[in-house]
Amino acid sequence: MAATASLKGHVLVLSGRLVGPDLGAVTEIGKQLLDLPERQLTVDLSHAEDTLDIAGVQWLVTIYRSAKNHGKQLSFVGISQPQRDALIISGFESIIDD
């Protein structure tokens, strides 16, 4: 299933496969999340498939760093073990342990 996103308050809920060809649909809603006035933001991965390729890792790292650059704190919830492993293998475990 292609990646989709919905914004529920200050929580970005991701669904589907977080892989390169499917990420375009979630990018615009990710920008909307960063534009919110709240300082505490959340990305919920509990509805996303376990599949996470390097483009998916890069997308998560990019939104995390963009939030930091906007003076906000972004946390991830609902991370599956395969998603966590992909971030660790890629060297980006700091975004989930922050």
Map each language-model feature to its residues.
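Amphipathic alpha-helical interaction surfaces in cytosolic regulatory modules
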Residues: 17-41, 45-96
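Short beta-strand/loop segment at the start of cytosolic alpha/beta domains
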Residues: 1-13
